Amino acid sequence: MKSTLRISLKSGERIFVNGAVLRVDRKVAVEFLNDVTFLLENHVLQPEDATTPLRQLYFIAQMILINPEGAEQSTAMFRKSIVMLLACFKNEEVLAELKRIDGLVTQGRAFEALKAIRGLYPIEERILNNQEITPATIDQIRKEIAPWR
């Protein structure tokens, strides 16, 4: 990190820092003075909300950050999921971004990968609404990923 990073948290808000969960009891500003892996509570996707292929990928990628002890298992599942998604999506923009996201995770930049995945949600919604990916394919992806959660 070239400069410090300052974030503000509201009373009761949680933040995930290097695998630990912290909750603040009052409004506070936190300044990170060195490299840190963190995820704000409002960016944490709950398992029951991982209802689409990209949201499932997001859930897996966030586990790399939230659970450092299980990062190896999460990364393996991420790789398996990326391969499946690259085979399912036909949209060139999505395919190019998935390849970039895979590179980010490979480089240890899972936080940036999460932001990129969130950026694909509107395109995914359009694809799913137009049934450019068949419901059977989506069900297959869910079956592959669901046991891991």
Swiss-Prot record:
Entry protein name: Probable flagellum biosynthesis repressor protein FlbT
Family in the record: Belongs to the FlbT family.
One Pfam family here: FlbT
Function noted in UniProt: Has a post-transcriptional repressor function in flagellum biogenesis. Associates with the 5'-UTR of fljK mRNA and promotes its degradation.
One GO MF term attached to the UniProt entry: mRNA 5'-UTR binding
Keywords: Bacterial flagellum biogenesis, Repressor, RNA-binding
A GO biological-process term: negative regulation of bacterial-type flagellum assembly
Domain of life (superkingdom): Bacteria
Stored InterPro entries: Flagellum_FlbT (IPR009967)
